[in-house]
Amino acid sequence: MLIFAICILGAMSTWAKEKDSDSLNYEHGGSIWEVDNIALLDNDIKNEIDCTIENIITPEMSDYDKVKAVHDYIVLNCEYDYENYVNDTIPQDSYSPRGVLINKKAVCEGYAAAFKAFMDELSIPCKLVSGKASSNGDFTGRVNHAWNRVEVGGVWYQIDVTWDDPVPDQKGKVRYKYFLLSDEEMNKTHLQVRNEKKI
């Protein structure tokens, strides 16, 4: 059995795959789902991704253009689930691509998982990263956080779609402060505490 686990915002997420099985089990906060693909939890999410790609991606786009289009789409169409975050009542969907794509509200794990799901569909190498984040670089006592690494033009960059989405939500506003940063740049505010996993 292959098992991958990360702890985000104080809750453990676990992906497990039996050796001779095509399905995966996803567990978060005590709930377990069997999924056909680790990033695409069900058909309506896959359909939403496919439809979105059809609308925002064109054949002549470079990988950079595709990454930017997906980044912008997520920021413009999802709102950080701040109210549930501060009340410690985050629903399961907010940790997944479903929160971003269907409910239009998510926390960092949902943003990162949705971004990875898009990259998987576009065949752009991408990894989910977990760690801690702090705008001032002081990681003492900071909450867990999730973001991504993505390969563009043969170079790996870090990207935090969550932190590029203004809170409170500002319709039509996209930031690029955490868009395709080098490891050195991202390490000023983000501390990876686990090995990144390609999922």
Label the model's feature ranges.
Residues 84-98, 107, 111-122:
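A conserved catalytic-loop motif detector
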Residues 110-183:
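Hydrophobic/aromatic-rich core segments of domains that either
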Residues 1-5:
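Sec-dependent N-terminal signal peptides
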Residues 17-47, 51:
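Low-complexity, acidic Ser/Thr/Pro-rich repeat tracts that form intrinsically disordered stalk/linker regions
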Residues 39-100:
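Secondary-structure boundary elements
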Residues 103:
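Short pre-catalytic strand/loop immediately N-terminal to key active-site residues, enriched for Gly-Thr
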Residues 182-199:
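Catalytic cores of secreted or luminal carbohydrate-active enzymes
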Residues 8-20:
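Sec-dependent signal peptide cleavage junction
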